Amino acid sequence: MRRPALAASRSAAAALLSVLLSAGLATYARPAEGQRVDLVNRTSLRVCADPANMPFSNDKGEGFENKIAEIVAAELKVPVEYTWFPQATGFIRQTLAAKRCDVVMGYAQGDELVLNTNPYYRSTYALVYRPGAGLDGVDHLADARLSGKRIGVVAGTPPATVMAGLGLIQQAKPYPLLVDRRYDSPGERMIGDIRSGDIDAGVLWGPMAGYFAASGGDKLKVVPLTKEAAGARLAYRITFGVRHLEDDWKRQLNALIARRQGDIDAVLLAFGVPLLDEQSNLITQPRR
């Protein structure tokens, strides 16, 4: 999945990357208007995905985007076929734009590198901390109890901007944004550092926070950040990404999302993804 930091930071100033993709993507050019050639394969669901990017995807089919791809393929009555490529610089250029696949299963709404479908979920960054360590009840970054605390944050993401505005960056521990997840997992390391006490808390994209906080070790508190009064936006709508001008394919996927929203929600909730409605209320049961 392409995390939402890129779309947010790009409008800010210097094209800071979302969870996964980066500057090399800017080389992808849209087809000229009128060049409406539908290149979608109708005999399989061709998906572009990262082979080592849990909880989103891996080459064993264990991620929630893998599971959602299976729902889509079942609805279309075709098998899933993957093109594997690390979600870093050049991902879209090397996969979707190169016509090696027809859909990216997780893409922040509003990014111009793809044509977005309707969103199939909305989530937010989350604060993670150990219960009983002095932060119980903290539910926003402006809480005075976070002052002076060592907080982990992925560099270049929207919460880093919010933390800077609140004076929380000087003591923060940064984690890298662009990595090859086959060899490094900053989100997983952040959660491990919270458990060990190396940091007091961490701020991480909600789907990663929910998954890694539940993956072994002591129970951690995961608080979706929905109450920030100022600073960068922390909640994002996530869509499927398809090639520009493939409007029929987009409409087909939109209809499929509407039909199978409850099944998609069930997958996301099982992975601990904090789901938000448009009023930023938590969704705790699949929508039907």
What do the PLM-derived regions correspond to, one by one?
Residues 12-24:
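Bacterial N-terminal signal peptides
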Residues 33-112, 181-184, 270-274:
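Extracytoplasmic small-molecule ligand-binding "clamshell" domains
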Residues 37, 79, 158-179, 254-288:
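Ligand-binding clefts/hinges and TM-proximal coupling segments of bilobed small-molecule sensing domains
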Residues 46, 51-55, 59-74, 127-186, ...:
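Bilobed "Venus flytrap"/periplasmic-binding protein-like clamshell domains
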Residues 50-51, 122-134, 214-257, 274-288:
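Periplasmic-binding protein-like
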Residues 63-75, 132-135, 139-158, 231-275:
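Extended ligand-binding regions for polar small-molecule ligands
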Residues 70, 74, 79-145, 156, ...:
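Acidic, polar ligand-binding/catalytic clefts
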Residues 78-79, 97-106, 149-150, 189-190, ...:
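Alpha-to-beta junction loops
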